[in-house]
Amino acid sequence: MRKTTISLVFLLLTLTAWCQQANYAKMSSMVRQLAMETTGRMRRMPSAGDRELCAFVRIEGNADSLLALYGGRSLARFGNLHVASIPLRSLSPLSLRPEVSRIEARQGNSIQMDTTLVLLGGAKAHAGELLPQAFTGRGVVVGVQDIGFDLTHPNFYDTSLSEYRIKRMWDFLSLDTLGSDLYVGAEYTTEEALKTYAHSRDAHIISHGTHTLGCAAGSGYDTSYRGMAPGSDICLVSNAVTEDISLIDSADVYKYTYALDALGFKYIFDYAKSVGKPCVVSFSEGSMMDFRGDDALYYEMLDSLVGPGRIIVASAGNAGHQVAHVVKPVGMESARVALISGGSSGYFSVKTTSDDYMLDFVLYGPDNARQTYLLRPVDIYLRSDSLLTDTLEVGGKPYYITATRYPSYYNAAEEVVEVIVGTDKRLGLDYYAGVDLKGENVELEMFRGGGYLVPEDESLGSSAYSIHSPSSAPAVICTGATGYRTQYVNYKGDLHVYNKGSNGERSDYSSVGPTFDGRVKPDVMAPGTNIISSYSSYYLEACPDASDIESDVEHFEFNGRTYAWNSNSGTSMSTPVAAGAIALWLEADPTLSRDDVMEVIRQTSRRYDESLEYPNNFYGYGEIDAYKGLLYILGLSDIKEISDHQPAAVRFSLSEDGRLCLGFPHPYAKPVMVRVFATSGTEVMSTQVLPEGGMAAVDLGALPRGVYAIQVCASDQALTGSTLIRR
């Protein structure tokens, strides 16, 4: 009876709302648009309001009862902040409730691969140069929220193939929903269930997650292409982004928002908590920042999710080689910017503290037809809801211009005008489209939203403010990409060259800061250009002629299927590399918080260009150094006798009975000093060895079990350095 009563109240409330205004000021732009569209559609078709939106909502008081009155429910709660499912018909009436102060949702994530080319193999990350012997991520959960997972790839076993390391997965797009308590999709929680399911639903159209997971936690199988934390446990969330949206039923499309991604992060952390292990989550997705504050509650939720032993790492974005910011200074009468998009529309924002300016559009059509369109801020202000929409025809070619204005979320003294320019075909490519920023007495800042900005005066443009969200969030560790190798040979024997920097130089595509509220981002860098990792056998099977298959470096058979190792580039790759390094640190200290990790990064990162001040908006604090970070966490970095780097040309192995073997370049046969330090800093052994046949051995069998630093000193600098071993 109670359920029936609530349903009747819900119907009455939503029907009454047709005659009321919504409080649009409480809504993010997507929620506002959905509320307005739904009100109109419901007049024609009442069932249009039945679809659900997954949103962030701030509610004071009894949120469960309030949401139930409007047909909604809370899916997760942190204080007065909820992730909630809300029928579209309820958005307007819910916004009128005094208990509700904000409703927020956003879509538009895309994966962060460098789409210029997809090439090569990142030796620094995956040939073991950063990997200490004593720490492999054991006892740590590495979470990856991504798309396109092949759960059967041997990279996700241990090296002996005796342990399957994926412990569970939530697939947002799974159709196995019968009996599932999850908001969307289904979870797979046993080895048998995971292997039977075999792959995320989208793995036949994309392999992104298979690659990023390998970067973070792959064992390498029988190759050197291992991830940073090959001993870790794995928990996955296969979410939904632009690239796999075609698999979503149109009735459910508004369930797949950033709020649902937040539930994905929570799912991974909840699993780690249930098994009593620390966790780092890698997220190689994102979208452009905005001035509307549409991610404000998202950032609060992320801040609530992280803590001691709970870290989120996200990709900076791959827009660093594009103009994202144009400045027309005071004293300059105008600055022309071409507008280009591979699609039919593009959008940009203009920010300033004055209304004393104009946007003068110059649009072309067939037969050299030309037309201008003058847009002043006051024109927008005079329209209802501060929304201007206009259409033009230039030589038979249609254009439409939509503009809105609002105060910047980050500084209310600054006004933002947001403009969408659209046409019937590719904007600015078939016929020129541009805008003159006019106003001699005012500085105008123009920001890229969608499409591309090409200033006539190149000196006015830069890649500043190109960092993506959610890596722009204060609680998230934002990772940019560096380059090392510049060429590779694919599985066909073809040589490919892709030079995006060497020796740890920032790859030009890696997005740069600051954030719109002025914070330095990225936080850290990691190898991201030309990284070799695992690729989906199901994608290879379904799309054998896809362009990215050309960057496969090897195909091999395992359990009757053909798998691949593939080269890829982007901050999508650097992010899991950084996350895997942090997993090693969490193994050393499971209580590390985000601030603790940032302090390790600040103290130990490698700085490519010492002439720069750090942190900066290109490199953050520098490139992550997993080994040097471990020395810092273990308290060994201040012991001058211990090098802060591993010997480049020495390989170590340790037998169960404590015999430490050192491999040297043959035929090196000069004396080598080996010193052994406990983590207390005490030297517990010192001996000199003479390599024979490129090998030498030291017996550590008498030492107690534990972690030790091994310092090797030789006349050859490549043979000098330290490593960590676990006795």
What is the predicted function of each stretch?
Residues 213, 235-242, 269-279, 309, ...:
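Hydrolase catalytic cores
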Residues 43-46, 247, 274, 278-287, ...:
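C-terminal subdomain of the subtilisin-like protease fold in secreted/lumenal serine endopeptidases
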Residues 129-259, 276-280, 307-309, 323-324, ...:
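Subtilisin-like serine protease catalytic core
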Residues 688-716:
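Short, surface-exposed loop/turn motifs with a glycine/proline- and acidic-biased composition
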Residues 27-47, 90, 111-162, 192-208, ...:
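N-terminal domain-start motif of subtilase-like serine proteases
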Residues 17-133, 141, 158, 243, ...:
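Autoinhibitory N-terminal propeptides
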Residues 149-210, 227-229, 275, 366-449, ...:
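Active-site core segment of subtilase-fold serine proteases
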Residues 19, 682, 705-727:
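C-terminal tail/sorting-segment detector
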